[in-house]
Amino acid sequence: VAGGIPIIKALREGLAGNAIGRITGILNGTCNFILSTMRATGRDFADVLKEAQGLGYAEADPAFDIDGIDAAHKLAILTSVAFGTEVDIKSVHVEGIRHVSSLDIRYADEFGYRIKLLGLAERDGKSGGIVQRVYPC
């Protein structure tokens, strides 16, 4: 999980005395490559996806990555460790990057923002439960 960063060990051992309220991160390298390349080159999603496949960053069937499923699974693992709870993957709201256009990227850039596929888990102040979502923002 998280590209070789020892995040699970840090959550289990290094942050054991702390209360974690939120996890936020970029959890899928394929999506990050696609979105970063779209921004840098102005090219459209399909073109950059094809490049990612040619470079071996994306699978022949990239749905697991670009539809956010891989990031959702990673988020569920991190949530389970960080919050000490079992996570049903079906409880994670998931949106992928398949519909992010070069125009979306350009508009975000004009306002000083970068579109990334983020995984976010946080405690719901009202219910006390955990809210999890993966979405481009």
Across the structure, where does each feature detected by a protein language model lie?
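Rossmann-like NAD(P)H-binding beta-loop-alpha module
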Residues: 2-58, 69-70
